[in-house]
Amino acid sequence: MNKAELIRNNIEKQVCSFFGSRSVTDFTPGLTPVPYAGRVYDEKELTALVDSALDFWLTAGRYARTFEEKLAEFTGARYSILTNSGSSAD
């Protein structure tokens, strides 16, 4: 494993630790706020985000390609492509 891979692995571990330190697990009815909307993600999504950023893929990259391939397979379509909105897909 080269130096860059070692650093990347360390960053992934740190991101997981960061996520774990921010997670709220206790809920007290009447005291704990329940947001009506908001971001919902786990440590896997957070590490994927950081991993993409380390490759400087700020738009569609290898994760998008993998998702497109799996979506096409799941739906039985020959191809699939991600867009940023329904308007862009027109």
Predicted segments — roles?
Residues 1-88:
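Conserved PLP-binding active-site segment in aminotransferase class I/II-type PLP enzymes
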